[in-house]
From Swiss-Prot:
UniProt protein name: Photosystem II reaction center protein H
Source organism: Anthoceros angustus
Record-linked Pfam families: PsbH
Alphabetical keyword list: Chloroplast, Membrane, Phosphoprotein, Photosynthesis, Photosystem II, Plastid, Thylakoid, Transmembrane, Transmembrane helix
Residues passing through the membrane, by range: 41-61
In-chain residues carrying the UniProt-annotated modification Phosphothreonine: T3
Length: 74
């Protein structure tokens, strides 16, 4: 029995729009990944600083034990 190949590509090109033409360059790098670690260390540092920020905010909100010596008068 022979295998039948069906072409699934659309026969029409679709409509072009001004917005599509503007946004097309933003999608040109889709799927490409730079080799190596890239900006991963910077993201790790940013996440660490954000975690410290959240801990400070939580301690201020809860008047934590670590801030017993600091007087806060709202």
């Amino acid at each position: 029995m022979a295998t039948q190949i069906i072409d699934d590509t659309p026969k029409t090109k679709g409509r072009r729009s001004g917005i599509g033409n503007i946004l097309k360059p933003l999608n040109s790098e889709y799927g490409k990944v730079a080799p190596g670690w890239g900006t991963t260390p910077l993201m790790g540092i940013a996440m660490g600083l954000f975690a410290v920020f959240l801990v400070i905010i939580l301690e201020l909100y809860n008047s934590s034990v670590l801030l017993d010596g600091v007087s806060v008068s709202w």
